[in-house]
Every structure is written in C-alpha cells, then in structure tokens.
C-alpha cells in the first residue's frame, strides 16, 4: 500500500510504501535509523541487519542526507516518536543519491541558511512554520466564507498608492508610470460597494529601508472591507478572526507547535474580546512606565508597542490615533476632529502590530478635501472618489499582516522564517 507519512496511522501492523527523502541517519553495526520526510511529516525508519537482505542494509548504511528513495516496511506504534509511529524497514529502492548536501546537522549561521533558503525549507523547523502558515491561510478562507464574504482579487500593478506614501517600487507600464501594490484596500472598497463584504489576499510591497525582525520588503496581507459596518463592529470581527486563527493553529498544528517549542498556553489565552485603549490612554500608560521620549502626535515604536502589550499580556486594540499619523481615507471621530476612528491590534510577546484598520471616509466632499490636503492627484483617485458619488455608505476595513501573524502564533523570532523566500533589504536571492 503506497501512502504518506501523515497517513501511516491508518496502517498499523500493515506493510506500506512511502516515497521520501533522508533527513538524517545514524547507524551501528547491526541497525540503521533513517529519519524520513515526505513533505507531509517525519518518521523514523528502522533497518535491522538480521531482518533484511544484505544489499538493503548496505544501502541503508551508505545512503546520504537528502537522497530520495521508496521505502517499504511495516508500520509500528511507538510512544517515543513525536508522531506515535515508526517504520520497520524491509525494502529500499534508491531514486537519487545526493552528494555534498550543504546543510549538515551541525549549526549554521543565518546568512548561510538564507543563502540556501531553497534547501533550508526542508528542515523540521521550517517545515513546521510553513505548515502553520498554510493552516492560517486555510482558516482565513474558512472564517470569511462562513460569514458571507467574497474573495476579491486586487491588482499588483497600480497607478497610485493607497497609503499616499513614497515607499513605492516604480516601474514603467508601457508609456505610463506604475507601482507595485502596497495594499489592495482601495480596490476592496470598490468590491464592497458591489458585493457587500469582501476580502483580498495577496502580496504587497514596501520600499522601506528597515532591517528589523518585523519587516519584509514583500509580504502578504489579508484585507477585508465591509459595507454598512462601522468602527466598533469592525473591531468585533477583527478579534473574532484572530481568535479563530489561534484556535485553528491549536487544533490542527500540535505536532508543529511541539517541534517549535511553542508555549501553547499563550495561544490558549487568545480569546475575544480583546482589551481596547485609546491612543491617549496608551500614551498615559507609557509615561507611567517611564517612557519620556514620546509626546502626543508621535507614533509608537517597537519598544512602546511591546510595553503596552506586556501590560495586557494578550492582543490589545489601540484606537483613535491622531489624524496626522494616519492615511487620508480614515473617518474622523464625530466628537474630536483631531483623531480618527481607527485601531491597531498589537500582539503580545513583542510581535507588534498585526492589524491596522479603520472606518473609511464615506462623504465625497470630506474625502476630496483630504486628498487635496495630502497633495494627492485627484485624477489618479477619481475612480476612488466615484465610490462616494453613487450610493456611498458607512464602511470599514482592516489589513492583517500574514507573516507577523505566523511569527506570533508559531513563536518565531524573525519574520524572515515565516515566508518561503523572504525579500529583505539586502536579499533578493534565492
């Protein structure tokens, strides 16, 4: 019976054949232990010299790391194994013998591993992180589909910036200027006016010269937009979504969390509702904690966000930021013209902002005024203004950074490990 490592539990005490690679091995005179991986998981294959043909045992001893093979054997239960099973090997068919695999079991530096990212992905740690990333993506689609959202695809090439910033990658689009997208938000707003509730999911690009553990040049965003949804209702959807992701990782990624040494009690504590504090309250809290380097109107940096998150020890919304700190499309608060109806969701354990969102301006004249105030060309945003001319309604949206969320839920220190091939300030290869 040909199967995968993830499915061997169905075949206890039965013979199976698995296509796999050698992740590692060790052997003595009479027994060889093969650490097998096939992409679905890892299992130990045990080859006993007295129980297999001579050529099979010789091959088990000579086969090299990352060689590929078909291995046939009987599935045994083993409480010592992380998966609960091992394979008593009876036959080995070599597909390809690898030579001089560069990532040996010894310790390697980060730059070396990043240079060999195409191979580093094969390690147990990277396998676990990618599985958690995949589960978060799958659970995202489940969450929004169950709530009546429509998936909307936004363009990667755009003629303007949703954020109105200069951190853009420029290219020529025949005879015009074009930019790699920083966000699908504006297009999602158009989608929400047609379909009610939508979400986009795709890569975004920021030409930021940042080298922190939280920043990537290319990263993936989940961006819902919702018609007839005001600020407070949007916050409720955000916290339900994040709690849903945490539960999904706990429910489906126990082996991966164990492999990464993640403290699962931290994830078990992620339950809605989340605390909410205003920017003003956050500023007061920071001053109580001895931060004298920040005044009203300043944005919070990583140390500030970490201090606020540590105070609550769970995700916390910081709401009502100064208008001057936020993009042109955010709705001013009805009771204070100097703050907007927005929120950043700050993850605990030093992982920083994972969601930014707001109620959007739905008044044509106010949006036009904001575009002019930010010196943004009205002709480039004419289509966006149109959304306020033909049946405009209150609406809200937010963006969740996938890589930061994966880092937080998996307990990974740096976001470079949370995307298959990271693009960093000093790295465009492989």
Curated annotation (Swiss-Prot):
<dbReference type="GO" id="GO:0003676">
    <property type="term" value="F:nucleic acid binding"/>
</dbReference>
<dbReference type="Pfam" id="PF01336">
    <property type="entry name" value="tRNA_anti-codon"/>
</dbReference>
<dbReference type="InterPro" id="IPR004365">
    <property type="entry name" value="NA-bd_OB_tRNA"/>
</dbReference>
<dbReference type="GO" id="GO:0005737">
    <property type="term" value="C:cytoplasm"/>
</dbReference>
<dbReference type="GO" id="GO:0140096">
    <property type="term" value="F:catalytic activity, acting on a protein"/>
</dbReference>
<dbReference type="InterPro" id="IPR004522">
    <property type="entry name" value="Asn-tRNA-ligase"/>
</dbReference>
<dbReference type="InterPro" id="IPR002312">
    <property type="entry name" value="Asp/Asn-tRNA-synth_IIb"/>
</dbReference>
<dbReference type="InterPro" id="IPR045864">
    <property type="entry name" value="aa-tRNA-synth_II/BPL/LPL"/>
</dbReference>
<dbReference type="InterPro" id="IPR004364">
    <property type="entry name" value="Aa-tRNA-synt_II"/>
</dbReference>
<comment type="subunit">
    <text>Homodimer.</text>
</comment>
<dbReference type="GO" id="GO:0004816">
    <property type="term" value="F:asparagine-tRNA ligase activity"/>
</dbReference>
<keyword id="KW-0067">ATP-binding</keyword>
<dbReference type="GO" id="GO:0005524">
    <property type="term" value="F:ATP binding"/>
</dbReference>
<dbReference type="GO" id="GO:0006421">
    <property type="term" value="P:asparaginyl-tRNA aminoacylation"/>
</dbReference>
<keyword id="KW-0030">Aminoacyl-tRNA synthetase</keyword>
<dbReference type="InterPro" id="IPR012340">
    <property type="entry name" value="NA-bd_OB-fold"/>
</dbReference>
<comment type="similarity">
    <text>Belongs to the class-II aminoacyl-tRNA synthetase family.</text>
</comment>
<dbReference type="InterPro" id="IPR006195">
    <property type="entry name" value="aa-tRNA-synth_II"/>
</dbReference>
<keyword id="KW-0436">Ligase</keyword>
<keyword id="KW-0963">Cytoplasm</keyword>
<keyword id="KW-0547">Nucleotide-binding</keyword>
<dbReference type="Pfam" id="PF00152">
    <property type="entry name" value="tRNA-synt_2"/>
</dbReference>
<keyword id="KW-0648">Protein biosynthesis</keyword>
<protein>
    <recommendedName>
        <fullName>Asparagine--tRNA ligase</fullName>
        <ecNumber>6.1.1.22</ecNumber>
    </recommendedName>
</protein>
<dbReference type="GO" id="GO:0016740">
    <property type="term" value="F:transferase activity"/>
</dbReference>
């Amino acid at each position: 019976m040909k199967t995968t490592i993830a499915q061997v539990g169905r075949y206890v005490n039965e013979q199976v054949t698995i296509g796999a690679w050698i992740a590692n091995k060790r052997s003595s005179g009479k027994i060889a232990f093969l650490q097998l991986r096939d992409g679905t998981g890892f299992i130990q294959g045990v080859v006993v010299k007295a129980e297999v043909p001579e050529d099979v045992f010789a091959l088990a001893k000579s086969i090299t790391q990352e060689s590929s093979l078909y291995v046939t054997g009987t599935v045994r239960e083993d409480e010592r194994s992380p998966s609960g099973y091992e394979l008593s090997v009876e036959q080995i068919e070599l597909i390809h013998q690898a030579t001089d695999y560069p990532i040996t079991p010894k310790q390697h530096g980060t730059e070396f591993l990043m240079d060999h990212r195409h191979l580093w992905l094969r390690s147990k740690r990277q396998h676990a992180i990618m599985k958690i990333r995949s589960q978060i993506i799958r659970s995202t689609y489940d969450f929004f589909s169950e709530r009546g959202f429509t998936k909307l695809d936004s363009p990667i090439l755009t003629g303007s910036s949703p954020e109105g910033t200069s951190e853009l990658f420029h290219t020529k689009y025949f005879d015009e200027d074009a930019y790699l997208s920083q966000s699908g938000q504006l297009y999602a707003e158009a989608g929400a006016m047609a379909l009610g509730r939508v979400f986009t999911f795709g890569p975004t690009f920021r030409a930021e010269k940042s080298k922190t553990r939280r920043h990537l040049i290319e990263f993936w965003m989940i961006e819902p937009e919702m018609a007839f949804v005001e600020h407070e209702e949007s916050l409720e959807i955000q916290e339900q979504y994040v709690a849903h992701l945490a539960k999904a990782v706990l429910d489906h990624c126990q082996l991966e969390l164990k492999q990464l040494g993640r403290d699962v009690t931290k994830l078990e504590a992620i339950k809605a509702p989340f605390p909410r504090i205003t920017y003003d309250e956050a500023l007061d809290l920071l001053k109580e904690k001895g931060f004298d380097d920040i005044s009203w109107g300043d944005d919070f940096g990583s140390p500030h966000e970490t201090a606020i998150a540590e105070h609550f020890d769970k995700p916390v919304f910081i709401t009502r930021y100064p208008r001057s700190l936020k993009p042109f499309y955010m709705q001013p608060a009805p009771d204070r013209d100097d703050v907007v109806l927005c929120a950043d969701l700050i993850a605990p354990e030093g992982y920083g902002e994972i969601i930014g969102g707001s109620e959007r301006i739905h008044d044509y004249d106010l949006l036009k005024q904001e575009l002019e105030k930010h010196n943004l060309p009205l002709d480039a945003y004419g289509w966006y203004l149109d959304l306020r001319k033909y049946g405009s309604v209150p609406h809200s949206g937010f963006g969740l950074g996938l890589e930061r969320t994966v880092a937080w839920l998996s307990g990974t220190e740096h976001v470079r490990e949370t995307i298959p091939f990271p693009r960093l300030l000093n790295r465009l290869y492989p």
